[in-house]
UniProtKB/Swiss-Prot annotation:
UniProt domain tr-type G: residue ranges: 540-710
Principal subcellular localization: cytoplasm
HAMAP family the record matches: IF_2_B
Basic and acidic residues composition-biased segments: 103-123, 227-237, 302-323, 381-393, 438-450
Record-level Gene Ontology MF annotations: GTP binding; GTPase activity; guanosine tetraphosphate binding; translation initiation factor activity
Task performed by this protein: One of the essential components for the initiation of protein synthesis. Protects formylmethionyl-tRNA from spontaneous hydrolysis and promotes its binding to the 30S ribosomal subunits. Also involved in the hydrolysis of GTP during the formation of the 70S ribosomal complex.
Organism: Caulobacter sp. (strain K31)
Pfam families, per database record: EF-G_D2 (PF22042), GTP_EFTU (PF00009), GTP_EFTU_D2 (PF03144), IF-2 (PF11987), IF2_assoc (PF08364), IF2_N (PF04760)
Gene name of the encoded protein: infB
Domain of life: Bacteria
Protein name, per record: Translation initiation factor IF-2
UniProt keyword Cytoplasm present: yes
Presence of keyword Protein biosynthesis: yes
Length: 1045
């Protein structure tokens, strides 16, 4: 560092080198004066250099990299400059500084080469992508061939100067295009243009100008100049300010119309006309290697170039024209190439229209592209995003997608949800296509002079049992307010969500001109059982015979003799408690299906069920016993089912058997046999000896032939559930009788409120079957629950139909259980009155049976036992073993568990012992019903019976201290006894009812009783109101237990 007095003396340095000074070189950079203070108290004034850091990179799409030839031409002046001045004469730099500068220049050159390589790679990609645009550009290329002329290469820039300013790049080679596709060159890319003007002769670069000197306004010939933006040092390092010159188009936002679609090849812009703009090298990115200095004085000043700083005033503001641009394909990526534009006019000349853009742009459309007002992928040159947003929000009439200040712009130009729908206020301002369509329709209606008449369309409206006003309006395609107005005119005030019945809904629909089709929930049952078969498809089937009669008259033994089996010996108590179905193959090859019904009175429903599904009835009557009550009941069931009867007089092998007695007893019930001129056949049989069995079979086959029993086996199966049970290991097992069609394995069956797919078919001998034809009894496995005996079953087409049917039936069953009808029905008031009177008592029970039919028989018998005072309340009934859940349910209800032919599991037994729940097992229905009848009888209130003893009259009343009142009486009738019940009557009014004679004395001695005619003293428990003349009636009360009938 030198003193300021040594400045300007070149010879003072002994080495011949120029002194190192902080003074700025003339015309290079701006300088300033700074006073330094040292620790020893000395001060010194030094001159410092003011540098402006410009870490901006050139715009990638506007400036081309110099070719290799240009780099060689640019390197020569630098070498001459460095060698001519020696080691220190070139700008006053030392050898180390020069080496450092050379290294920086080489690094900059390598950086430019890398950029050129990247451009060439991008050009190669763009060439393949521009194939689609060649056809459109070929038409303009033909007109451009005649006017196209190649432009000469621009000279290289002179040697650099020490000033830290960026180099001026060599001018890119501009050639006339042959085709619209970009051509790859080793130096700079050649842009396609319809007519490129001839480039000017190269001019030497002007000397560097001080950056702080004022700059004149640009001339008319200098149209555009790219200069790094001073306002965006902190925003984007590669942003360049685009400043227009005089005669340039107006600044501000670009037109908001759609741009031409299609991708533009990377960096394939049209050749620039002659002029000084765009003649500078790209500036390095911030933090990159420093560029070499400009050469000083190479070629002298360019007089045509304005010097000095640019005007510091604001740029021209305002919006650009708002006309629409031709539609173009939306570029979703910021790196996607742009379509090749047309050639630009010369400086100061008039600008032609862009390719595809009309001369006069139309007005802005009603719906603008949501991405139109967003910045370009590369960003506007020299403009901050905040300024762009402010200007475009204030000036652009289109819908702009909002973006927070300082938000990243890397996704600009991409199609996103925010771009389409907007956010915040922009989403509220965005008009939908439907809104625009409605606006257009309103305009058309205004031009036509009013809205067009709406033609009402008559529809078929489906109306269920109940429907809301809203649903009715939807089905009629009418506004709900119109229906409400109509109902108001009819005097009905309803809201949109109110429910109306089907009659009102039909009236409304008819008033509006629609046709009505009424449906109901019960319509799901339609088609469950198929239609009747055509006679041409019918084939003979086996007869179904039901054996009925009184208990212990030999029905099962007779079937065993016919089947040559022994079923009766295995039954509990020797009686049948289940309905059985068997198919017997006769010696002739014919088949007969037999149904065995129980004879006990409890199984009345089973007998009725068997009579309804049979073709004929065999009425078994014991020859030694005659007609019994269940025999009469069987006759009634057969008549109700309108089926013929064959009377079989059994046990004819016994000595006391008399068939004539049986015939006479049947006459009392209007059963006339053939021997007496009737139509009922009678056969004398013996199941033990086999007497008359063949004749019985002949009568059955003859009657079946007369009845001409036929069915169609080639249709879907349907029939009746005979019995059902829950078997451990097999699940729900149902015994069904197929009436029509053929039941196959895999069919979907609906039985009552249960459905499932048939997994197995078993006959009475437990043999697997693949199918079961008409009049065949089988056991089916696969249902999801145990159906009720007597329920019809049918095969449906799919599970959806089966589920629809079962859900409807379950809903009906639940509604019936919630609202019972008949004898068991009672209102809440009646039940509360009975509970308050303590006269209504219930016995809760949980019943589990082996089959569903037995459970129904038990429940029916218990219902018959009920009276107005006591009744059995069934908490749960079902088929299957007793489980732990049954035990817990019985504990909660305080009910005993009844098991009929079933047992409890080990876990259920242990749980019942811990919880104190009683489990009772029964195998015969007699025992079960007798025990339950005894329990219900014990719950009945006993009958109180009075026994008269005697009367006494009160002669005098004594009031004794510490004792109370004592009545002095005389026994007038009978005898009075100590401890007996008394009734005190005064003036024919009972004063005390059911009092107790506590003390009885004769004179001073207590006596047990006093006979008639004697006097005594009496004192009553809890009663002191004794007066002379009262009559005392003495009696005893006896309680007698009641029994159910």
């Amino acid at each position: 560092m030198s003193d300021e007095n040594d400045n300007g003396r070149p010879g003072s340095n002994p080495g011949g080198r120029a002194p190192i000074t902080l003074k700025p070189r003339q015309g290079s950079v701006s300088a300033g004066v700074v006073k330094q203070s040292f620790s020893h108290g000395r001060t010194k004034t030094v001159v410092v250099e003011t540098k402006r850091v410009r870490p901006h990179a050139p715009p990638a799409g506007n400036l081309a990299a110099p070719s290799s030839a240009e780099r060689r031409q640019g390197d020569a002046p630098r070498q001459q400059s460095s060698s001519g001045g020696g080691g220190s004469s070139a700008g006053g730099l030392s050898q180390g500084e020069m080496l450092a500068r050379q290294r920086a220049i080489e690094a900059a050159r390598e950086h430019q080469e890398r950029q050129a390589a990247e451009r060439r790679a991008a050009e190669a990609r763009a060439a393949s992508e521009a194939a689609a645009a060649r056809d459109a550009a070929a038409k303009s290329a033909a007109a451009a061939k005649a006017a196209a002329a190649p432009a000469p290469e621009a000279p290289a820039a002179p040697a650099p100067t020490p000033a830290p300013v960026a180099q001026a790049p060599a001018a890119p080679v501009v050639q006339a295009p042959v085709v619209a596709a970009p051509v790859q060159a080793p130096a700079a890319p050649v842009a396609a243009a319809p007519a490129a003007p001839r480039a000017e002769a190269p001019r030497p670069a002007p000397p560097p100008v001080r950056s702080d000197a004022p700059r004149p306004a640009p001339t008319a010939g200098q149209t555009r100049t790219y200069e790094p933006s001073r306002d965006r040092r902190d925003d984007r390092s590669s942003t360049t300010t685009y400043r227009p010159g005089p005669g340039a188009p107006p600044q501000g936002d670009r037109p908001q119309g759609d741009r031409p679609q299609g991708d533009r090849p990377f960096n394939q812009r049209a050749p620039r006309p002659d002029g000084p703009y765009n003649q500078r090298t790209p500036r390095p990115d911030a933090g990159g290697p420093p560029r070499g200095p400009r050469p000083e004085g190479a070629g002298g000043f360019r007089n045509d170039r304005p010097q000095g700083d640019r005007p510091q005033g604001d740029r021209p503001q305002g919006d650009r024209p708002q006309g629409d641009r031709p539609t173009q394909t939306v570029r979703y990526s910021a790196l996607a190439p742009r379509p090749a534009p047309g050639a630009r006019p010369g400086p100061g000349g008039p600008r032609g229209a862009r390719p595809g853009v009309p001369a006069s742009a139309p007005a802005t459309p009603e719906i603008q592209r949501a991405t139109r007002s967003a910045p370009r992928p590369g960003g506007d040159v020299g403009r901050k995003p905040e300024e762009d947003d402010d200007r475009r929000k204030a000036a652009a009439p289109g819908k702009a997608v909002s973006r927070a200040k300082g938000a990243p712009i890397r996704r600009e130009g991409r199609l996103t949800i925010q771009t389409v729908a907007g956010d915040g206020d922009s989403a509220d301002r965005m008009r939908s296509l439907a809104s625009v369509r409605r606006a257009r329709e309103r305009e058309k209606e205004k031009r036509r002079g009013g809205p067009a008449d709406v033609v009402k369309v008559a529809r078929e409206v489906i109306i269920p049992d109940v429907i809301t006003v809203q649903e009715l309006s939807n089905r009629m395609a009418v506004r709900g307010v119109e229906i409400i107005k109509f109902l108001m005119r009819q005097g009905v005030m309803l809201k949109i969500n109110d429910v109306i019945d089907n009659d009102t809904a039909e009236l409304v629909a008819t008033e509006f001109g629609h046709t009505v089709r009424r449906v109901s929930e019960a319509d799901v049952e339609e088609g469950f059982i198929g239609a009747e078969d055509v006679d041409d498809h019918l084939e003979p089937r086996p007869p179904v015979v039901t054996v009925m009669g009184h208990v212990d008259h030999g029905k099962t033994s007779l079937l065993d003799a016919l089947r040559k089996a022994d079923v009766a010996s295995g039954e509990h108590g020797g009686i049948t408690q289940h309905i059985g179905a068997y198919q017997v193959r006769l010696e002739s090859g014919q088949k007969v299906t037999f149904l065995d019904t129980p004879g006990h009175a409890a199984f009345s429903q089973m007998r009725a069920r068997g009579a309804n599904i049979t073709d004929l009835v065999i009425l078994v009557v014991a020859g030694d016993d005659g007609v019994m009550p269940q025999t009469v009941e069987a006759i009634k069931h057969a008549r109700a089912a309108e089926v013929p009867i064959i009377v079989a007089v059994n046990k004819m092998d016994k000595p006391g058997a008399d068939s004539t007695r049986v015939v006479n007893e049947l006459l009392q019930h209007e059963i006339v046999v053939e021997s007496l001129g009737g139509d009922t056949q009678i056969v004398e049989v013996s199941a033990k000896t086999g007497q008359g069995l063949d004749e019985l079979i002949e009568r059955i086959l003859l009657l079946a032939e007369v009845m001409d029993l036929k069915a169609n086996p080639d249709r879907t199966a349907d029939g009746v559930v005979i019995e059902a049970k829950l078997d451990k290991g097999r699940g729900a097992v149902s015994t069904v009788l197929v009436k029509r069609g053929t039941l196959k394995r895999g069919d979907i069956v609906v039985a009552g409120s249960q459905f499932g797919r048939v997994r197995a078919l078993l006959n009475e001998r437990n043999e697997q079957l693949t199918e079961a034809g008409p009049a065949t009894p089988v056991e089916i496995l696969g249902l999801d629950g145990v159906p009720s005996p007597g329920d019809p079953f049918a095969v449906v087409e799919n599970e959806a139909r089966a589920r629809e049917l079962t859900e409807y039936r379950i809903r009906l069953k639940r509604e019936k259980s919630m609202h019972p009808v008949g004898a068991g029905a009672t209102s809440m008031a009646d039940m509360m009155a009975k509970l308050q009177d303590k006269k209504y008592r219930e016995l809760p029970l949980v019943i589990k049976a082996d089959v569903q039919g037995s459970a129904e028989a038990i429940i029916g018998s218990l219902d018959a036992m009920s009276t107005d005072e006591v009744r059995a309340r069934i908490i749960l009934s079902g088929a299957g073993a007793i489980s732990e859940s049954d035990v817990m349910l019985a504990k909660g209800a305080g009910a005993p568990l009844i098991g009929f032919n079933v047992r409890a599991s080990a876990q259920a037994r242990a749980l019942a012992e811990r919880e104190g729940v009683e489990i009772r097992y029964y195998a015969i229905i007699y025992d079960l019903l007798d025990d339950i009848k005894g329990v219900l009888s014990g719950m009945l209130a006993p009958i109180q019976r009075e026994t008269f003893l005697g009367n006494a009259e009160v002669l005098q009343a004594f009031d004794i201290s510490k004792v109370g009142k004592v009545a002095g009486c005389r026994v007038t009738e009978g005898v009075v006894r100590k401890g007996a019940k008394v009734r005190i009557i005064r003036n024919d009014i009972v004063v005390l009812e059911l009092g107790t004679l506590q003390t009885l004395k004769r004179f001073k001695d207590e006596v047990p009783e006093v006979p008639s005619g004697q006097e005594c003293g009496m004192m009553f428990a809890g009663f002191q109101d004794i007066k002379v003349g009262d009559t005392i009636e003495c009696f005893t009360v006896e309680e007698i237990k009641r029994q159910l009938d």
